């Protein structure tokens, strides 16, 4: 129960942080999704730092790891988890699996959004 609570609180903080970055990026103007790009890159950098730190330091309580990675970074961006998983596949030499994971996730994600929008636009 404690782990679920710390993930819940962390996700709320990460989501609020994401909203703040998007608001700040919107002030730059333009139609390019700079906020999302900044969030995805920053989240991926943070995921690498935290994962590496946990591995080197060890002894970090599970609740803290969940709060920081699954909670805050999960609320901030799921792209950081996607990036970590793709990197770990490549690091293990599973290049075909990594390519399938990256290309499949992106292609299926875009197709899913497109199909859902088409249904709503047609029948919504």
Curated annotation (Swiss-Prot):
Compartment(s) of residence: Cell inner membrane
Pfam families, alphabetically?
A: CRCB
Q: Where does Na(+) bind?
A: 74, 77
Q: Which UniProt keywords apply?
A: Cell inner membrane, Cell membrane, Ion channel, Ion transport, Membrane, Metal-binding, Sodium, Transmembrane, Transmembrane helix, Transport
Gene Ontology CC, one term:
plasma membrane
Q: Does the keyword Transport apply?
A: yes
Q: How is its activity regulated?
A: Na(+) is not transported, but it plays an essential structural role and its presence is essential for fluoride channel function.
Q: Would the keyword Transport be found if you checked this record's keyword annotation? A: yes
Entry membrane topology: Multi-pass membrane protein
Quickly give the catalysed reaction: fluoride(in) = fluoride(out)
Alphabetized GO MF terms: fluoride channel activity; metal ion binding
Q: Where are the transmembrane segments?
A: 5-25, 36-56, 70-90, 100-120
Q: Which GO terms describe its biological process?
A: cellular detoxification of fluoride
Classify the main location: membrane
> What job does the chain carry out?
Fluoride-specific ion channel. Important for reducing fluoride concentration in the cell, thus reducing its toxicity.
Which NCBIfam families is this protein grouped with? crcB, PRK14198.1
Entry's family note: Belongs to the fluoride channel Fluc/FEX (TC 1.A.43) family.
Give the protein's recorded name: Fluoride-specific ion channel FluC
| Gene that encodes it | fluC
